[in-house]
Amino acid sequence: MSDKNSRIAIVSADKCKPKKCRQECKRSCPVVKTGKLCIEVTPTSKIAFISEILCIGCGICVKKCPFDAIQIINLPTNLEAHVTHRYSANSFKLHRLPTPRPGQVLGLVGTNGIGKSTALKILAGKQKPNLGRFDDPPEWQEIIKYFRGSELQNYFTKMLEDDIKAIIKPQYVDNIPRAIKGPVQKVGELLKLRMEKSPEDVKRYIKILQLENVLKRDIEKLSGGELQRFAIGMSCVQEADVYMFDEPSSYLDVKQRLNAAQIIRSLLAPTKYVICVEHDLSVLDYLSDFVCIIYGVPSVYGVVTLPASVREGINIFLDGHIPAENLRFRTEALQFRIADATEDLQNDSASRAFSYPSLKKTQGDFVLNVEEGEFSDSEILVMMGENGTGKTTLIKLLAGALKPDEGQDIPKLNVSMKPQKIAPKFPGTVRQLFFKKIRGQFLNPQFQTDVVKPLRIDDIIDQEVQHLSGGELQRVAIVLALGIPADIYLIDEPSAYLDSEQRIICSKVIRRFILHNKKTAFIVEHDFIMATYLADKVIVFEGIPSKNAHARAPESLLTGCNRFLKNLNVTFRRDPNSFRPRINKLDSQMDKEQKSSGNYFFLDNTGI
């Protein structure tokens, strides 16, 4: 599609039925009346064809179509003008740039592969923007002239005069141990090497990030969450003018996410810039002062919008429509009505109930006590608790992979499990993997419609499993876990590496699958928005991480979330437009009111 097309025509293959209508779209089109072939369709054709080059965007066919099969979407006409960077011919291009403001946190929100990391690289001075001229890149003088009149002009001028030092916390923290060469490998020593702030500040960072216990450990012995906290700490102990954090919340539990957000906010000063890319929308909301959305087509083009306030920006992203540019970048809005979830549930009297006894498990110094509980078919139980409180241990106990110390054995049930860490060892393509492991389900049309299609597996079906990115692997792992016939599905952190949009789709897929097939799912999830969307019941884990923990019996979403948030000392409210949970700022009026009334998690009437 050339950039000159200012609109895009969509004809839904499912809805368009030329055999059953009188081709109203073609008859009513003013361009066809002048003798041009703008819409081509006959009673025998399978689907109508609309020429985007000839289309004038009048929208008459959209109104006339009896099946609502046509959409005409206006694309931004200025896409050609605002190219900031293009890697090479026929490759990804980025339009415009986010504008950081001193003394404020800028949040970036958008799907994977749409240019967020490219934008960070350019703002950090690691990539020189070529304004789309990849064959003869412009000089800095010309680049600054191009951005004149905007806040970016001052920013790049400062950067050229070496006045700006930028630090990026990388997106994939798993690669950090390999990148650190040299004799110094201990966490504490590495932090000391980079330390440019006062010892009091550094002590405070170490305390809030809970790094005291790992200071003497080697960097390669750290878990994912510890590496993430170490990476945030490394960025914070250095003096810089621009701090950039690429996905600071992956691997962290809810409490650590909020601590990380507080630390990132504490870096602000009147002359400092802080930029943050984050897919957990509740953390992004808590963290940012204003946001830029990046929309477009993944690995084709990305467009950065003008800055908007946090609430406005996240709602625009969920809605998929930008009022300022009168542009729709997603066909449907992403909604968080917990009512959606329960409407699918038919009151089935024939649902089976299962129960498990109270259990105790000791692993080294760690002791986990589990209260007895019960669950039934078509039910999703979300486990909430900090890292290191035994959620994965309970999953393994239920799966029969671990034996309890005392208490009865767990009744034998078929179990399918998606582990937290996914290591691809399979030597073949995704299709071969599915055929080997879940052939029956994979060929089942219902499974294709419910799970495979919405997770967009078709885009990666013929790629080598070992070459997939984190998010692609996660989607494959979810399909594999759901494809194995079982009574109970145990899913550990389904949101890791997925972007905000995929997280919501993934929640819907898991939910629909569990309800339709009358199964039970136990899910560990730290993204609070996703957890509340998925949960029918909640199991709260309390105690001291890595020492002793107590898993309570399953309870309702409201009482469970209230108990969990009370332990964290955090309150949530609901956004009136999109119904998503939003974190109240600490000691704000809402925060104090909700704490005094004991309502930590708010399910107001509009959301039910």
UniProtKB/Swiss-Prot annotation:
GO terms for cellular component: cytoplasm; cytosol; nucleus. ATP binds at residues 110-117, 385-392. It comes from the Eukaryota. Residues 70-320, 345-568 form the ABC transporter domain. The modification Phosphoserine is found at residue 349. The keyword Cytoplasm applies. Keywords: ATP-binding, Cytoplasm, Initiation factor, Nucleotide-binding, Nucleus, Phosphoprotein, Protein biosynthesis, Repeat, Ribosome biogenesis, rRNA processing, Transport. Residues 7-39, 46-75 form the 4Fe-4S ferredoxin-type domain. This is Translation initiation factor RLI1. The gene is RLI1.
